[in-house]
């Protein structure tokens, strides 16, 4: 069980390989980078909100 935290830390520290598109892009293709950026931004916002609002509702920016 002592190896599990070490494995998780190494997994988080390892750089991810860049994605390679198998198909050439055409003018009709929507760039996936914008989708990835939007998803990443949304997940970061939800993560920050979850950390902030978990025990301290007064620090939550959308708390009403």
From Swiss-Prot:
It is found in: Secreted. Expressed by the venom duct. InterPro entries: T-conotoxin. One of its GO terms (molecular function) is toxin activity. GO terms for cellular component: extracellular region. Residues 23-48 form a propeptide. Contains 2 disulfide bonds that can be either 'C1-C3, C2-C4' or 'C1-C4, C2-C3', since these disulfide connectivities have been observed for conotoxins with cysteine framework V (for examples, see AC P0DQQ7 and AC P81755). Residues 1-22 form the signal peptide. It holds the Pfam family Chi-conotoxin. Keywords: Cleavage on pair of basic residues, Disulfide bond, Secreted, Signal, Toxin. The cysteine framework is V (CC-CC). Belongs to the conotoxin T superfamily. This is Conotoxin LiC121. It comes from Conus lividus.
């Amino acid at each position: 069980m002592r190896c599990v935290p070490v494995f998780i830390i190494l997994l988080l520290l390892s750089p991810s390989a860049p994605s390679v598109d198998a198909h050439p892009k055409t003018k009709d293709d929507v760039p996936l980078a914008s989708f990835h950026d939007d998803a990443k931004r949304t997940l970061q916002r939800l993560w920050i909100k979850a950390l902030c609002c978990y025990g301290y509702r007064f620090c939550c920016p959308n708390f009403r």
